[in-house]
Amino acid sequence: DAYSGEYNKVRDNVFRTNTSLAWLLNKSWITNLKFDASIYYNDNNSHAHTFYSYASEQPAVHATEEGYFMANKLPYTYFADQIIDSKELDYAASLKYEWNRRFKTVNSNLKAGVQWKATGNVGEGEYYKDPSLAPNGYRPRPYTTYPYMHNVSLYAEESLSFPVGNTMLRLMAGVRWEHLFIKGTKYKNLNTLSPRFNARWQLNEHIAIRGGWGITEKLPSFYTLYPKQEYRDIQTFGFSYNKIESSYIYYSQPYTLLHNENLRWQRNQNAEIGLDVNIARTRISLVGYFNRTKLPYKYASTYTPFSYDVLQLPDGFTMPTNPQINVDNQ
C-alpha cells in the first residue's frame, strides 16, 4: 500500500526429483520389480509489513513458562514485520513386486510391495523481526521443533480372472498395513490394517454385475499424535499511573491437547453392489452402497480446577508517577 507503507512479499519455490528403476525379469516366480524414490522440497516464505495504530496502550503477553508475568507494552503506532518461513522437505521410496501367470484358463496378477515416506518441515515458522512488536498471545513455534513423521506400509493384491461358462468372472483381494513413527509421541501401536475385496461378473457384452467390500482404518492427525504447545493467559492485575500509562499482570499457563490412552482408531466400512448395462452406446449403472464409520474422532473438553491469585490495590492507595514494579513469577 503506497499510502500507508504496508506491503506483502511472498516467495514460493518448489524442487522435485525422482528416480525409477524397473527390472523386467520375466521369471517363473517374478515378472518385474520396480523401485521408485523421490524428494520434495517446498520453500515458502511470506513477509507482511503491517501498520498498527491504537488509541490506548495495548498489552502483549509472550511468556512461555507457567507463572505471573508483566505484559509488554505495544506502541501506540508502529510497523510490525511478520515472517512465516515454511520449508517442507519430504522423502519417499517404494519397492514393488509383480507376478503375472496363467494356470490353464485362470489369469493371475499378484502385486506386493513396501513403501516409506517421511514428511517434515525445516522452516522457522512464524516469527517477527522485532520480537517486542509481536502481538498479544504470540509465541515462537519453529517447525523444526516438530519431529518427522515416517510412514511405512506393506501391501499385497491378487487379481484373478477366469471364464464361467460363457461369462467372465474377475476377483480382486488386497490388504494394506501401515505404521507411523513419530519421535516423542505418547501413542503406541500406530498401525492400521485395511482389507478390501472386489468382484465383477461379465454376463455378456452388455450386462455386468459388480460388488465390493472394504475396511479402512484412519489414524488421527499429526497434531493429535504430537500436540502443539498452547498457552492460556489470564489477567490478574491492572493499574494506571502517570495519567495515561497502564500496566498489566498476567498468569500464563502452558498446556497441550490431552493424551487419551484409550483412543481407538477410526474405522470406515464400505460395501456396494451394482449393475452395469451397455445398450445402444448408452451406459446405465445402478449402484447400491453401504457406508459406516465406527469410532469417529471428535474433540471433547475436560475441566480440571486450578487456582491463581487476583490482586487489587488497597483502598485509598495512590499509584506513584513512576512506580517500580517487581513480579514474583511464582
Question: For the regions a protein language model found, what residue spans apply to each?
Answer:
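Intrinsic-disorder/low-complexity regions
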Residues: 35, 197, 275, 321, ...
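Surface-exposed loop/turn segments flanking beta-strands in extracellular/periplasmic regions
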Residues: 2, 54-78, 120-142, 230-257, ...
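Outer membrane beta-barrel strand-and-loop segments of large Gram-negative receptors
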Residues: 82, 88-94, 263-264, 279, ...
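Structural signature of Gram-negative outer-membrane beta-barrels, strongest in the C-terminal barrel
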Residues: 145-292
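Outer-membrane beta-barrel translocator domains and adjoining extracellular loop/strand segments
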Residues: 1-7, 45-54, 122-130, 183-193, ...
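Short, solvent-exposed coil/turn linker segments
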Residues: 131-133, 221, 326
